[in-house]
Amino acid sequence: MYILETNSFKYYLGERLLFKLPALKLHTKSRIGLIGLNGSGKTTLLELLAGIRPIPAAAKIICKTTMTILPQLKERLSKSGGETTQAYILQALKQQSGLLLADEPTNNLDMDHLLWLEKELRHYSGALILVFHDRDFLDALCNEIWALDDKQLQIYQGNYSNYQQQKIISEKTHDQAYRKYIMQKTHLETAFSAKQQQAQKAVKTTKISLSEARITGAKPYFAKKQKKLQQTGQSLLTRLDKLKQIEKRQSLPIIKMNLLSSKLWQG
């Protein structure tokens, strides 16, 4: 049973595209790990799904369950950072909503509280969307990874380790396509530039005598030659315009804060 569904839509901040979403579907057992570069829109996405940020006119978000969001920025209370974080977590967990959205809930927690949080989330009865920078949490709790990468949300089945394996294959394929695109683009640009130079030289008569250049038919010959070179150049330019552009990929941050096992990993 799906508890939350969206259509595919784009989200802008002013005139800047923040991200493009595919159609999303969450069921009761969804355990989503949301990852991405700082500023990629993770918090914004949670707020859109939670209904606390206005959605675009073309967007459609249908939620069929109760929802609680645990925000990253907490109100100031007369407690330490760890106690404040724990207080918000307890409050959110007690609501037992069908969908819990948590934005970096491990902030300010010590090791004992991290282990406690991992246990609580593991046994949480509802669905989860979690923003973490900890590989152990992502591996222990998630069955799907949402990666905000290059202004698009990519979906990977499995935990963070599964995501890494799929990502390596995807990156190799993309890098090969990017290198091929650059080679084709460079080849066409070089060929076009050469034809332009040849066309400019075609009307010059420095290598023949003035009397030869005045012979009837000489000028039409060079003009015809120039036109043919220009047509070839235009054909190359058309091919260049039709060449599918492939952008150089941006790498997501290395996740290495494995606090649960206290080991350092590099994803």
Listing of model-derived features with the role each one plays in the protein:
Residues 1-174, 263-267:
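ABC ATP-binding cassette signature C-motif
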Residues 1-13, 81, 166-267:
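Coupling and communication elements adjacent to P-loop NTPase active sites across diverse families
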